[in-house]
Amino acid sequence: MAQLYYKYGTMNSGKTIEILKVAHNYEEQGKPVVIMTSALDTRDGFGIVSSRIGMRREAIPISNDIDIFTFIAQLEEKPYCVLIDESQFLSKQNVYDLARVVDELNVPVMAFGLKNDFQNNLFEGSKHLLLLADKIDEIKTICQYCSKKATMVLRTENGKPVYEGDQIQIGGNETYIPVCRKHYFNPEI
């Protein structure tokens, strides 16, 4: 029976490389997958899943007006798995569509993303994935300043920590840093 998986981690925890690895493993066995990513993430181009170690692949961009369930249901070849990158940016409806893909089409869905933003608030997509997922796993990484587990994301601008502002600002290593709780409140910047 298919399940909805939510795999979350901070920046630099290897979420995207995990997606690319899972896709490769399925496809090596001749089992097609669908890779999707938020249309908001355009760092490396529209509809591109890209890891920090240089691996990249085309993906179906997800906007708030796409009906993910209908899109998957109408594919000529049923996928063995649907893989979602940047799932924190999904809308509530997007997440409910993913649950329908699992429940009605019997296709496993693995959603990868951040859990909380730089203000330690849940993203909309994360909130609903935490509510609906059958299995929830943390992808761990370490704090940039010590060897404790990173559980938070620190936003920086011009080398200074930022605790206020818009929730969504697409960036990379130069803007967001994985940190533990101690270094979130007292970064060594």
Swiss-Prot record:
Active site (record annotation): E86
GO biological process, one term: DNA biosynthetic process
Keyword Zinc: yes
Keywords: ATP-binding, Cytoplasm, DNA synthesis, Kinase, Metal-binding, Nucleotide-binding, Transferase, Zinc
Enzyme Commission designation: 2.7.1.21
Database matches in InterPro entries: P-loop_NTPase, Thymidine_kinase, Thymidine_kinase_CS
Chief place where the protein resides: cytoplasm
Binding residue positions for ATP: G9, T10, M11, N12, S13, G14, K15, T16, D85, E86, S87, Q88
Catalytic activity field: thymidine + ATP = dTMP + ADP + H(+)
Family statement drawn from the similarity comment of this UniProt entry: Belongs to the thymidine kinase family.
Name the record gives this protein: Thymidine kinase
